[in-house]
Regions:
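Metal-dependent amide/peptide-bond hydrolase catalytic core
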Residues: 1-170
């Protein structure tokens, strides 16, 4: 990209404009859905670019996330295809892992698909062949300024953890 004074944008090439065009393409894309896990989601998590308001931006970057419920290779190909339409944009894969199908039919627990990441897929099968996600609180308040867990939920989770231990030891 090429910097210039913002009063003469035709003398430069804006990295932020190029990146926004690519991000708009990704935002407008449709992503796979699963009858079991629900829809995949796309999020532009961070966006950085430019030096000052009166300079055509010489650089920009974004960190995005697709939480996929199926077909990791297909999603990667789709992202690469969309980005390939924007020759000034470079694609770097930072982190990836496939959808996680866990043990979900356990007596005494309600099961539901969730749209958030977990380290569970990284647990090695030989050490942890049966895996679940369980814990108090709500993902709907996670990562926000008012994140919290209600005390009764925390106390009730003790019994839940005990049930899980007994389930996995049986």
């Amino acid at each position: 990209m090429k910097t210039s004074h913002s009063g003469y944008p035709h003398l430069g090439k804006s990295a932020t404009s190029a990146l926004l065009a690519a991000l708009n393409g990704l935002s407008a894309a449709s992503w796979p859905e699963s009858d079991l896990l629900g829809p995949s989601t796309f999020n532009i998590g961070t966006l950085e670019g430019g030096e000052k308001h009166n300079i055509v931006a010489p650089s920009a970057k974004a960190l995005c996330e697709v939480r996929m419920v199926a077909d990791l290779p297909g999603i990667k190909a789709k992202v690469a295809d969309i980005i390939s339409r924007h020759p000034d944009i470079e694609l770097n894969w930072v982190f990836e892992y496939p959808e996680a199908l866990l043990e979900w039919e356990i007596d005494g627990f309600e099961a539901a698909p969730v749209a958030f990441g977990t380290d569970v897929p990284r647990l090695r099968d030989e050490f942890c062949g049966r895996r679940v996600l369980y814990g108090p609180g709500s993902i709907l308040v996670a990562h926000g300024p008012d994140e919290f867990i209600r005390v009764p939920e925390l106390i009730d989770s003790i019994a839940g953890y005990k049930k899980l231990v007994l389930h996995f030891l049986s």
